């Protein structure tokens, strides 16, 4: 049956149609059978690209275009070996890109599985939490505020239920839902008007409901739309975009240098075909072939590593932003605290008692009524080892059981027939129950629980010795004093009240029943994390809905705030204009009793102050501030809406995990920065070695095949090793956060690139000229006159054997010096003797492979023929190794001078 018909059927007709039960749901066996028959409740994955499509995508790069042009020109000039090598390199580069992107894609797909939403389903009359993907048609689903609707559902029960359906209708105003609504059978009604239906991917913003699943997966309304949508472009990170722009710039510069050199050759009356080959070589030298692959694999591996420390990254750009975070705004409950609430104190009509001393003292009418209210006005459930619901409500159930009162029994005695769910504006929750009498029901009673300062405002009476008596001003003052006392002890407070009100009468004129104080101990590791943040230049700010005294007590214990003046309440915040708030914001460390709108204001105020803000949250009302923050951090136990709005999810709800994530973010950025500086300084050295030699009228020190070999073998492998290097976390977290717009070449990066580029240029030229200079010296023809010296070199390098050997020297030195250079680049602040090589086994492997292949290219006959190299003696290898080690010696000298 089409999903669009169910809004025209009453509840029983829908239940019969889907062979389900509106109270008990399906049996586990029937649910399993339907899952096997109809498949999982998931959107079909986008059609995967073919291997050919993936390969061609790798060629869509300006840097690759240069290599392809170089290959074509080489063919026209008769240099077939160079053309074959360039073509081979392009193919290998594309294949490596496909493999690495495949690895990145698999990592992200694994993360998607980790972030798949859960849902509450009722099967065989038992509420249980299952992955939304396992829902089947006919399942009875429980819907609460903050949940993402997991399938298309015909409502069977609704209580103040509102659903935001912008994902389907484009209308952002939540729609009031009504399970009893019945559409006119004679007319087709628009989706937005089907108020007895809720649809997959929409969001419950308010209230509570239950319903029968009518469609899953691609059969849902959103599934039909998804089947018509073409594949979306994959999101690129800001760093990837910047590196893409850098690639385009390098392409332009490369062509400019080639054109300049060609014009110079014409001016010098050089051989035109020969100079075309040189220009091709220069173009190749300017292309850092390994750069895109390094960045892709570095980010993907980082995301995979974060899973091991209980962090799920939902958006790749977040990895970069993490490293720049300067303020962490954290909720208190469950993040800075353990979220293991226990009732420690309770108060009823002037009796304040430790909960531990209340064991078995449920005989007092006041205690019974207060507990009855807190257990009935409660949506949590205890089912053996499975605890489902809000930690506050679970703590009340635990306390009730300790006192000999059980919610399930009370629910049978006082069945709930309506409710007003908790929301952040009212700060209360009310449920309406039938009163039992002589086997029947007489009248009704309403129980309300919420923040004591809010509840007391709605009360006119107080329960005294089992009777409801008018509340005096003195009693109101006493309640306020009890709340302050509990808050000063870092206890969360919750009050209960009762009334004879019906759902249409509001929540006024209630009778105050009592207060409980619950302790949520601070996480021991949170204090250490706050201190690490302080040393790292990252401020910690607590934002909570709790009372200011409770919040300050925890903040002081954790080292977030040292003085009461660093705290502000939502009410005080309302009285501050933007200018006053901007002046105070740097000193405020605790925000208490704040609304969702105020959270957004706090985030934006910090951002206007130049801060990069990470914000934690777990509720539906946290979604706006999570979206507003630079990094939205949702809790693993949070609602689906918060997770969808967040950039990052903490699966252990632990504040200390944020510190590990920021450390990882800083480390990833530093690794990419090291790789970029290494690759560009190496390519600059190759480019300038050739440019200077040719500008002097000499032959080219390197062939294009030599440069490609260096760039792919002795550049790309070490660059990849640098990209996955294990950083010193303690050192990283002793530095202030970088600015979000900071260039990769900031903090000495440009100087480092130019210094090592110049050094590699000198080494390359020295290696190229050492043989002809030696011959000139042996003849006694080494002249201090530059023109005579250049003329002598030019004459010697015109001889094929001398040129081949000189090019072999330059090729070998430039290839090996990249390996030495990479070892030093692991940590620009530390001596290589202070680094532990086995912390980066990939670097060890890259160096071993690099040296072995560089040796092979001058010793294996097939490779000698392909690359036009010469066999080297042991003495020559020793000399060239000394020259190649200069970048490492320079690194040690720089480190020594800094100290």
Say what each PLM segment does.
Residues 758-774, 854-868:
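Alpha-helical transmembrane segments and their membrane-interface junctions
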Residues 1-736, 742-745, 811, 828-899:
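Conserved cytosolic headpiece of P-type ATPases
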Residues 26, 767-770, 774, 803, ...:
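C-terminal substrate-binding/catalytic lobe of Rossmann-fold NAD(P)-dependent dehydrogenases
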């Amino acid at each position: 049956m089409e999903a669009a018909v169910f809004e025209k059927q009453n509840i029983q007709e829908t239940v019969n149609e889907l062979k389900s039960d509106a109270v008990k749901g399906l049996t586990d066996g029937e649910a399993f059978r339907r899952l096997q028959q109809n498949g999982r409740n998931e959107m079909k994955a986008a059609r995967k690209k073919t291997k050919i499509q993936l390969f061609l995508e790798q060629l869509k790069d300006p840097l690759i275009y240069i290599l392809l042009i170089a290959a074509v020109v080489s063919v026209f000039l008769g240099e077939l070996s160079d053309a074959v090598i360039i073509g081979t390199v392009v193919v290998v580069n594309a294949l490596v890109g496909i493999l690495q992107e495949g690895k990145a894609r698999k990592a992200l797909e694994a993360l998607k599985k980790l972030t798949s939403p859960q849902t509450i389903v009722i099967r065989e009359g038992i509420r249980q939490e299952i992955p939304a993907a396992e829902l089947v048609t006919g399942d009875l689903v429980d819907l609460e505020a903050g949940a993402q609707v997991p399938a298309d559902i015909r409502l069977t029960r609704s209580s103040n239920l509102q659903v935001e359906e912008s994902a389907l209708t484009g209308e952002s105003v939540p729609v009031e839902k009504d399970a009893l609504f019945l559409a006119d059978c004679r007319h087709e009604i628009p989706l937005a008007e089907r108020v007895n239906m809720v649809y997959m991917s929409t969001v419950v913003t308010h209230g509570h409901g239950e319903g029968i699943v009518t469609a899953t997966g691609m059969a849902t309304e959103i599934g039909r739309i998804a089947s018509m949508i073409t594949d979306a472009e994959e999101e690129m990170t800001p760093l990837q975009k910047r590196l893409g722009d850098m690639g385009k710039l390098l392409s332009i510069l490369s062509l400019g240098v080639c054109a300049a050199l060609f014009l110079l050759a014409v001016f010098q009356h050089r051989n035109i075909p020969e100079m075309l080959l040189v220009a091709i070589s220069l173009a190749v030298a300017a292309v850092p072939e390994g750069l895109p692959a390094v960045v892709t694999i570095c980010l993907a591996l980082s995301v995979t590593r974060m899973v091991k420390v209980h962090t799920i990254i939902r958006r790749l750009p977040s990895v970069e932003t993490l490293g720049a975070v300067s303020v962490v705004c954290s909720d208190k409950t469950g993040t800075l605290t353990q979220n293991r609430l226990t009732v420690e104190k309770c108060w009823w009509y002037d009796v304040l008692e430790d909960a531990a001393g209340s064991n078995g003292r449920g005989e007092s009418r006041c205690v019974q009524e207060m507990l009855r209210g807190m257990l009935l006005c409660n949506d949590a459930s205890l089912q053996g080892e499975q605890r489902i619901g809000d930690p506050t409500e679970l703590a009340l159930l635990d306390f009730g059981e300790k006192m000999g009162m059980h919610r399930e029994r009370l629910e049978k005695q006082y069945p709930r027939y309506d409710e007003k769910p908790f929301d952040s504006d009212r700060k209360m929750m009310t449920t309406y129950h039938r009163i039992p009498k002589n086997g029947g029901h007489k009248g009704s009673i309403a129980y309300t629980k919420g923040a004591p300062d809010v509840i007391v405002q709605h009360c006119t009476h107080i329960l005294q010795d089992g009777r409801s008596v008018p509340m005096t001003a003195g009693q109101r003052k006493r309640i306020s004093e009890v709340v302050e006392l509990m808050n000063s002890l870092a206890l969360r407070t919750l009050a209960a009240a009762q009334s004879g009100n019906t759902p249409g009468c509001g929540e006024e004129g209630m009778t105050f029943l009592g207060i409980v104080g619950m302790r949520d101990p601070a996480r021991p590791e949170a204090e250490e994390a706050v201190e690490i943040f302080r040393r790292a230049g990252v401020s910690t700010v607590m934002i909570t809905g709790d009372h200011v005294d409770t919040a300050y007590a925890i903040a002081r214990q954790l080292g977030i705030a040292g003085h009461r003046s660093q705290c502000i309440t939502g009410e005080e915040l309302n009285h501050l204009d933007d200018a006053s708030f901007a002046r105070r914001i740097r000193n405020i460390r605790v925000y208490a009793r704040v609304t969702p709108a105020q959270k957004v204001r706090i985030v934006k105020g910090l951002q206007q102050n130049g801060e990069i803000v990470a914000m934690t949250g777990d509720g539906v009302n946290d979604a706006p501030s999570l979206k507003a923050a630079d990094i939205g951090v949702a809790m693993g136990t949070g609602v689906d809406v918060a997770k969808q709005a967040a950039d990052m999810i903490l699966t252990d709800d632990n504040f200390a995990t944020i510190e590990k994530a920021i450390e990882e973010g800083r480390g990833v950025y530093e690794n990419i920065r090291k790789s970029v500086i290494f690759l560009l300084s190496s390519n600059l050295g190759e480019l300038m070695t050739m440019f200077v030699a040719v500008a002097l009228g000499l032959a080219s020190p390197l062939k294009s095949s030599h440069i490609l070999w260096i760039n792919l073998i002795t550049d790309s492998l070490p660059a990849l090793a640098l990209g996955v290097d294990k950083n010193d976390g303690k050192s990283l977290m002793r530095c202030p956060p970088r600015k979000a717009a900071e260039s990769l070449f900031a903090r000495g990066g440009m100087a480092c690139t130019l210094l090592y580029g110049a050094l590699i240029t000198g080494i390359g030229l020295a290696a190229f000229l050492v043989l002809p200079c030696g011959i000139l010296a042996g003849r006694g023809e080494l002249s201090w006159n530059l023109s005579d010296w250049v003329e002598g070199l030019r004459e010697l390098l015109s001889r094929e054997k001398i040129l081949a050997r000189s090019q072999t020297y330059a090729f070998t030195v430039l290839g090996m010096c990249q390996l030495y250079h990479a070892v030093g680049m692991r940590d620009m602040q530390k001596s290589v003797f202070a680094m532990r090589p086995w912390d980066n086994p990939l670097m060890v492997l890259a160096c071993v492979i690099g040296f072995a292949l560089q040796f092979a290219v001058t010793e294996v006959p097939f490779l000698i023929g392909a690359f036009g190299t010469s066999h080297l003696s042991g003495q020559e290898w020793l000399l060239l190794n000394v020259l190649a080690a200069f970048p490492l010696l320079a690194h040690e000298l720089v480190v020594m001078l800094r100290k």
